[in-house]
């Protein structure tokens, strides 16, 4: 069957060192996985606990470590709660961005940053 997800808890959302250690421990517990998916639920929540510069530095290191190992990292941010400039800087450290919006009651998405995917808004069912 499928392996159990590795869940590590930290004492505080501001504990960036603890998050980094938990990531390393989770990967180490799995041996050398050829496929790993890292989900970072909310950059916006992180920013309630640490300043933008620390958050950016942490996310940059985490995304580089994830990418260097050949893993997939998925990070979410609510762009409506941050300045456009900050959102653009943060998303620049990732390979691509998936944007979601609601238009006339329909949900749409677009992918930016992948050369083989056109950056046009596309409806998707929910």
Predicted regions, residues:
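Conserved catalytic network of the ASCE P-loop NTPase/AAA+ motor domain
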Residues: 28-32, 64-69, 91-92
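N-terminal start-of-chain detector that recognizes signal peptides
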Residues: 45-46, 68-72, 82-84, 97
